[in-house]
Curated annotation (Swiss-Prot):
Subcellular location: Cell membrane; Cell surface
Post-translational modification: Processing of ComGD in competent cells requires ComC.
Organism: Bacillus subtilis (strain 168)
A single GO cellular-component term on record: type II protein secretion system complex
The protein's assembly and partners: The transformation pili are flexible filaments, consisting mainly of the major pilin ComGC and smaller amounts of the minor pilins, including at least ComGD, ComGF and ComGG. Interacts with ComGF. Interacts with ComGG.
Protein name: Competence protein ComGD
Length: 143
């Protein structure tokens, strides 16, 4: 019965700890870069929400055969549909800048806007939302 312990191959405690510490350092490095990605997602979602709200206001004007409007303020925008007012506050760190659009966007009974123009949603990324006069078409573009 000869037992040879020295021929067993494996990792030492020092080698295992070294690999685990390198893996944890890499994970920390990866997860510290995620907040900017989250912030970019927040800006994209805010631009998408604003586009959807513009289209909702337009479609409601057509379906109810009444004028609807969106009012833009410094910290929020409001959808005014008949007697109903829906307030949408801007997320923290985001701002909405009216480039060529006035502080009020109205849709008539046929869904046509009273004015066309651009709105800029700014945060870690920048999105321009264009409302076209006449057709009322809404386009979102990342800058």
């Amino acid at each position: 019965m000869n037992i040879k312990l020295n021929e067993e191959k494996g990792f030492t405690l020092l080698e295992s700890l070294l690999v685990l510490s390198l893996a944890s350092i890499l994970l920390v490095a990866v997860f510290t870069t995620l907040p900017p990605a989250y912030d970019n997602t927040a800006v994209r979602q805010a631009a998408s929400q604003l586009k959807n709200d513009i289209m909702l206001t337009q479609q409601t004007a057509i379906s109810r055969q009444q004028r609807t409007k969106i009012l833009f303020h410094k910290k929020e925008y409001q959808l005014v549909i008949g007697d109903t007012v829906i307030e949408r506050p801007y997320a923290t760190g985001l701002s909405i800048e009216l480039l060529t659009l006035k502080d009020r966007l109205e849709f008539n009974e046929k869904g046509h806007p009273n004015a066309g123009g651009k709105i800029r949603v700014k945060g870690h990324a920048v999105y321009d939302i264009t409302v076209y006069l006449g057709s009322g078409r809404v386009n979102v573009e990342r800058k």
